[in-house]
Design a protein with these regions (language model features):
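Extended recognition/assembly regions associated with phosphoester-bond processing machinery
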Residues: 1-234
Length: 234
């Protein structure tokens, strides 16, 4: 399978960040954002150049926190920007992969929706993604936890229907279909932190989701020592 991979999409939070939540500094090995991004650069440099990598920011990454977010600023790590096969995009972003339209969004607004909508939870992120598609807006609640920049145009509106909707943020790998749209939450590579436990997040880390762009069939590789829970919604 690995030999057939042509694209890698990273939906934000490349790093843990600095000062994101109380006492975070006690958990960090790399204490600066530059050190953390250098680790990312070193890891991504192991990916062959024929594979294109798309990187968007999340709320733990450096740069503007308010949505929509510009790409991670070059001043924090110029090496990522200078790689021929790396494309730094904003949050949200719409990209085309061999004619397949992919809408990428880190997913900060999931926090607001889970808190205000009965029946939705962090454990089932694709249900929240359906809510966003129905609303035709990626951050439909204003004035809550998610900061939204006062732009002249609302760039969070979903104008075009994507083929694939890719979200992150909640550290839960999960997939589903909704009206012909493939919904993917790409999960995380980090085990549960004390902060995540305090807000009710239960990650299933170490799961790589791989999409066949011709058939839309999804494969997964589990790099976690724990048995894989069902990531397919009914």
């Amino acid at each position: 399978v690995a030999r057939k991979i042509r694209y890698v999409l990273i939906g934000g939070d490349l790093v843990d960040g600095v000062g994101i939540y109380p006492n975070q500094d006690k958990e960090l090995v790399c204490q600066t954002i530059e050190e953390q991004l250098k680790k990312v650069e070193d890891l991504l440099s192991k990916i062959p150049n024929y594979i294109k990598i798309f990187i968007m920011p999340g709320n733990h990454d450096p740069g503007r926190r308010a949505l929509p977010q510009p790409a991670i600023p070059k001043k924090y790590n110029s090496g990522l920007w200078e790689k021929e096969n790396v494309f730094m995009v904003g949050n949200p972003a719409v990209i085309s992969l061999n004619g397949v339209k992919v809408m990428m969004f880190h997913g900060q607004s999931i926090d607001d929706i889970v808190k205000t909508t009965p029946g939705l939870s962090y454990d089932k992120p694709t249900n929240v993604m359906k809510h966003l598609l129905r609303a035709r807006h990626l951050s439909p609640i204003y004035g809550s936890q998610t900061p939204i920049a006062p732009e002249m145009e609302d760039l969070m509106v979903i104008d075009d229907i994507p083929d694939i909707f890719h979200v992150g943020h909640v550290h839960r790998a999960e997939l589903d279909m909704y009206k012909g749209i493939l919904l993917l939450n790409s999960g995380s590579w980090q085990k549960q932190t004390p902060f995540q436990a305090s807000v009710g997040m239960t990650p299933n880390p170490g799961i790589a989701l791989i999409v066949n762009l011709k058939t839309f069939k999804v494969y997964h590789e589990n790099y976690n020592s724990n048995p894989l829970n069902n990531i397919l919604q009914s």
